[in-house]
Amino acid sequence: MNQTYGRLVSRAAIAATVMASLLLLIKIFAWWYTGSVSILAALVDSLVDIAASLTNLLVVRYSLQPADDEHTFGHGKAESLAALAQSMFISGSALFLFLTGIQHLITPTPMNEPGVGIVVTLIALVCTIILVTFQRWVVRKTQSQAVRADMLHYQSDVMMNGAILVALGLAWYGWHRADALFALGIGIYILYSALRMGYEAVQSLLDRALPDEERQEIIDIVTSWPGVNGAHDLRTRQSGPTRFIQIHLEMEDNLPLVQAHLVAEQVEQAILRRFPGSDVIIHQDPCSVVPREGKRFELS
């Protein structure tokens, strides 16, 4: 799984970097030719895209390194750090967009050749949609937080390019303040996306538990297994592609140690079949010593 994960995540990061570089060149020409503040906003966003995607590429490669003596749980948390860094990059570009929009709202500037801007923005929109579609497929396959953060970033670019098309169309008919108004709206939306991305990254760094549905699947696997009377103290988290799962099994007092170990091994393999690549730790407890208080999961 780790090989497939690494290959897909690396390709997604490289694709994003190449696409952002191509779009930057196109937008530099479009801004120089039209003077549109919305296209300037998109140009600045492409600069941020390149910085964020390059950061993503470097961090993803680092996060894929195997565990070592100093990082016994691996380097997966680097993905969360990349997502947090991206949220900061994006917040900065959103602030620049907002301030530029206010300036041009107060002093609107007529646009040169909005038709050229429309063509360029259409090209950027199509390219970004293709990239987001690929990233969404990679996220579905890998659940990579770094790629998901990048995807959210480029999804906001799709919204931005759509808004720019409308603004350029209105400017073509003489409503020059539309350009600035849409720049303000885009800035607000991008800031919202950045804050949401930063929140998710911080939650991962704080070792938030796996989603409720995944934890319930683990409980269902454990409590339905022959020889297991119940379970307690389920603890989960995720670091990069790896899920970390710890749980205590409750077994009959007179069950031989070898048999208890065999049951625990079978449960572990069942969990790994459902969540490949996980790090699973199972502890066996005799029913008579199981504390009555705390979070317990009994057979139904």
From Swiss-Prot:
Look up keyword Nucleotide-binding and say if it applies: no
State the Gene Ontology BP annotations: intracellular zinc ion homeostasis
This enzyme catalyses:
Zn(2+)(in) + H(+)(out) = Zn(2+)(out) + H(+)(in); Cd(2+)(in) + H(+)(out) = Cd(2+)(out) + H(+)(in); Fe(2+)(in) + H(+)(out) = Fe(2+)(out) + H(+)(in)
Source domain of life: Bacteria
Q: Which family does it belong to?
A: Belongs to the cation diffusion facilitator (CDF) transporter (TC 2.A.4) family. FieF subfamily.
Q: What does this protein do?
A: Divalent metal cation transporter which exports Zn(2+), Cd(2+) and possibly Fe(2+). May be involved in zinc and iron detoxification by efflux.
Q: How does it assemble?
A: Homodimer.
Protein name (record) = Cation-efflux pump FieF
